[in-house]
Design a protein with these regions (language model features):
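Non-catalytic interaction/Regulatory regions outside core domains
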Residues: 1-112
């Protein structure tokens, strides 16, 4: 299994986690207290499930191909963002991160 520590090498990354299909935390690295990591894993799993459903609906209504299965999602706040690909989620500081580098690192880990 690929190491989540690779994500912490991306400038601006503050923490990352991997979750199981039921939403339980598999592992976490960085500045994420265990109780926050547990909640974040549940949130990431729930959001991923919702995005899969949204992608299915969008593909069905639009007739466009290539939307399913959805692979990931992102949510941006004022200072921090959350990026998810597969069952890996990374938390970053917006003012420091290169989103291109983050996506490359997430892709390497998620597609191994």
């Amino acid at each position: 299994m690929a190491s989540l520590d690779e994500l912490l090498q991306v400038k601006g990354a503050v923490g990352a986690l991997r979750f199981y299909d039921d939403g339980t935390l598999a592992e976490a690295v960085g500045d994420l207290p265990r109780e926050h990591a547990d909640l974040a894993a549940e949130m990431a799993n729930a959001t991923s499930t919702m995005m899969h459903q949204e992608a299915d609906l969008f593909a069905s209504y639009s007739g466009m191909r290539g939307w399913t299965p959805s692979e990931g999602w992102a949510m941006q706040g004022d200072q921090y963002s959350v990026w998810n690909l597969g069952n890996i989620t990374c938390f970053v500081r917006n003012g420091e991160v290169s989103y291109n580098e983050l996506y490359k690192a997430l892709s390497r880990l998620a597609h191994r």
